[in-house]
Amino acid sequence: MKQLPAATVRLLSSSQIITSVVSVVKELIENSLDAGATSVDVKLENYGFDKIEVRDNGEGIKAVDAPVMAMKYYTSKINSHEDLENLTTYGFRGEALGSICCIAEVLITTRTAADNFSTQYVLDGSGHILSQKPSHLGQGTTVTALRLFKNLPVRKQFYSTAKKCKDEIKKIQDLLMSFGILKPDLRIVFVHNKAVIWQKSRVSDHKMALMSVLGTAVMNNMESFQYHSEESQIYLSGFLPKCDADHSFTSLSTPERSFIFINSRPVHQKDILKLIRHHYNLKCLKESTRLYPVFFLKIDVPTADVDVNLTPDKSQVLLQNKESVLIALENLMTTCYGPLPSTNSYENNKTDVSAADIVLSKTAETDVLFNKVESSGKNYSNVDTSVIPFQNDMHNDESGKNTDDCLNHQISIGDFGYGHCSSEISNIDKNTKNAFQDISMSNVSWENSQTEYSKTCFISSVKHTQSENGNKDHIDESGENEEEAGLENSSEISADEWSRGNILKNSVGENIEPVKILVPEKSLPCKVSNNNYPIPEQMNLNEDSCNKKSNVIDNKSGKVTAYDLLSNRVIKKPMSASALFVQDHRPQFLIENPKTSLEDATLQIEELWKTLSEEEKLKYEEKATKDLERYNSQMKRAIEQESQMSLKDGRKKIKPTSAWNLAQKHKLKTSLSNQPKLDELLQSQIEKRRSQNIKMVQIPFSMKNLKINFKKQNKVDLEEKDEPCLIHNLRFPDAWLMTSKTEVMLLNPYRVEEALLFKRLLENHKLPAEPLEKPIMLTESLFNGSHYLDVLYKMTADDQRYSGSTYLSDPRLTANGFKIKLIPGVSITENYLEIEGMANCLPFYGVADLKEILNAILNRNAKEVYECRPRKVISYLEGEAVRLSRQLPMYLSKEDIQDIIYRMKHQFGNEIKECVHGRPFFHHLTYLPETT
């Protein structure tokens, strides 16, 4: 064996600590927070691989500590391992800066309150200082990492795809949001390629911080909580969704908005997340268990009970009193949402399968399936209630419970397709004892189904009957006594016996199989297996009808709308088989993948259509054939009704032949029938104008009186007007002598031209919008409300393009350099906007400037472009006006000066008398003496 070189050891250990861009940002932000920073700016270039800069206003690094500030295992946080029991800082290992130095080029600029100026240090791969120089930055520390992973080409290649780079940006934004919520008084700005991705200002408390991150609409559905356990010294606080909240705001398909903090440290704790999600889904989301609640949980425990030195990124911790924390959290959830309907404590959920809720729907977390549910007359497999911890029985239905009572029970039998759910529930309500007798496989689906046709049906716990007479068709009426006996024996069954799988028996004495793969029967060749919604009519089709190919045209080009307008009747156009398949599966696909665009979702579902078997495609081809027949019949009916209406007027009835020919004849007939009326109206107007007589009116007129009045008016005009008169220049480029009726003054023509240029740019200049690498999604949380989004939705838009996207064409947006795309959703309320292009000629131009434009439109009722220019654009246009005015010739002719004065008079009047710098156009010299 040989000892590895020191440089190799540093590189290997550093690549384990710094694994991505987000890990660099996390380490540097934690150092900033440990230094007491209240403002943090994070700037990235090329997704952080070219440059990462984190600037704060913390205490700074002392000059005596600078030589070892980036050396590994040098830290000011702790002195020995015993200090970990009282740890109050984020960092403690002293590895972050040293590890970053090994895989990037690092510059550190720092200044303390005692320093007169800041100092910039250039570090080498070992953390030693190569050079230093003074800097202009204020108090705090700025760490810049250049060329990340410069000596790890494989690691850099891993992030070469655009998707992985965008995922890193998303992770960094989520990290900054976590710290922004945890530290309400912390100001955060996140910039990528000079474009502001996300920012948060200082706020007063956690509620305002959550509102700035999640939005007002989400916080209106949240409620605060506090819980304190003196015995275990556990303190819980935060915000949870209300029981009656709008779950479209408080639920997500991913846990990215489930914030958990332990001792002010953002962590990932699966057990805590699972417990909260379990309570939330059972009490608030009975129709789905796949969603994650939006919540903020802050857990404070003694520092000695937490081990944070578990993973390199410190995102996971070990709790010494984990069970106490879970019990306290369960008590809190019970207080907020009430007790669970099936279990008494969280521990019962972890013991064995018998103590878990058996959920057999498309939204279940398990893959357990009931099998052998047939329609051949056999009853449902008998299950002993002694091993199922449910206290509900089937007698609840006898007391007049309606179908909604089924939703409170814990056994769910699939999703009933095409309206069978309601019929089956009604049968259960009427005949309790025969509830499971007539349920067939055609009424139960175990896979993902159509959202509009599916509903999860919950049925109460199943009784066990083992009658000696072998009756398999009915449940024994003496089930109550057997149930009591079964409950007494429930304590005798252990988890070990249950795991052997021989506890539950069916009516013939066979073991119940919890999982079984269902294979389609050969006698049903037309059965559709994609969504498992067999239609009864399809079950009786023979092989000839199944193999018969439809002549429906799948792809149609040139569609403008989905409807035809014929004879004042709106007729929906027929859809192809693939279009019907996309229409059925797109809502569920978008629910499971909310971040996928509508175009990408359609493409992925179309690819899924290509992989379907012929039997699965046959279902949609038959639907398409029926839809085409419906379309043709509606077309014929509409034309026949129109023909009958025309027959009453004495016109010949049109004999219907085909839908297309009749539509063409109808259009031709309509146009010809209106032509005589138009000719008659036009001819009558011409004849009317010809027949009108010219009226003659005599007015007394005198040329002498006209001349007298003209002279009087001319004299009055000369007295009222005080027109300036241009005399001559004074051999200076910016000094022209002018006089008015009362004074002599100097004119600076360049200032006037500067103001004229600025006014023209303000009204007409259009900033070019450059495409963004990553479009910015416009949400309510970004604008702190929905009022700004409502203004955008009301703006004009251009014609719809092939991609299905519409671009806002309002000049108040386009002239200010914003290209905003409106992407339609499943419904009108689910449309969303994103900034696809933005002007890059202004630094730090972004969403804040768009908000300034919308604020002018909303509050000042700005109609024109010049009324809603952001301050950055105004400053930019002022600079452009100055630049253009300085390009004018040094000496202007008298005609040019007169033209400038003329334009100044007609464009400004008496309103504007200064240039963009606030300097006047005219300089007063002297007043002229009055003449008598």
Curated annotation (Swiss-Prot):
**Keywords of this entry:** DNA damage, DNA repair, DNA-binding, Hereditary nonpolyposis colorectal cancer, Nucleus, Tumor suppressor
Q: Which cysteine pairs make disulfide bonds?
A: none
Q: Name one GO biological process term.
A: mismatch repair
MF terms from GO for this chain are: ATP binding; ATP hydrolysis activity; ATP-dependent DNA damage sensor activity; DNA binding; enzyme binding; mismatched DNA binding
Quote the InterPro entries the UniProt record gives: DNA_mismatch_repair_CS, DNA_mismatch_S5_2-like, HATPase_C_sf, HMG_box_dom, HMG_box_dom_sf, MutL/Mlh/PMS, MutL/Mlh/Pms-like, Ribosomal_Su5_D2-typ_SF
Ranges for the region named Disordered are 465-493
The answer to whether UniProt assigns keyword Membrane to this entry is: no
Location of the protein in the cell: Nucleus
Q: Which CDD domains match?
A: HATPase_MutL-MLH-PMS-like, HMG-box_PMS1, MutL_Trans_hPMS_1_like
Q: Which Gene3D superfamilies match?
A: 3.30.230.10, High mobility group box domain (1.10.30.10), Histidine kinase-like ATPase, C-terminal domain (3.30.565.10)
Pfam families linked: DNA_mis_repair (PF01119), HATPase_c_3 (PF13589), HMG_box (PF00505)
Residue intervals annotated as DNA-binding region are: 571-639
Report the main location listed first in the record.
nucleus
**What GO CC terms are in its UniProt record?**
MutLalpha complex; nucleus
Asked if the Swiss-Prot or TrEMBL record annotates the protein with the keyword DNA-binding, the reply is: yes
State whether it acts alone or in a complex, and with which partners, per the record.
Component of the DNA mismatch repair (MMR) complex composed at least of MSH2, MSH3, MSH6, PMS1 and MLH1. The MutL-beta complex is a heterodimer of PMS1 and MLH1. Interacts with MCM9.
Task: Family membership, please give it.
Answer: Belongs to the DNA mismatch repair MutL/HexB family.
Biological role: Probably involved in the repair of mismatches in DNA.
Q: What is this protein's name?
A: PMS1 protein homolog 1
Provide the species name: Homo sapiens
Q: What is the lineage of its organism?
A: Eukaryota, Metazoa, Chordata, Craniata, Vertebrata
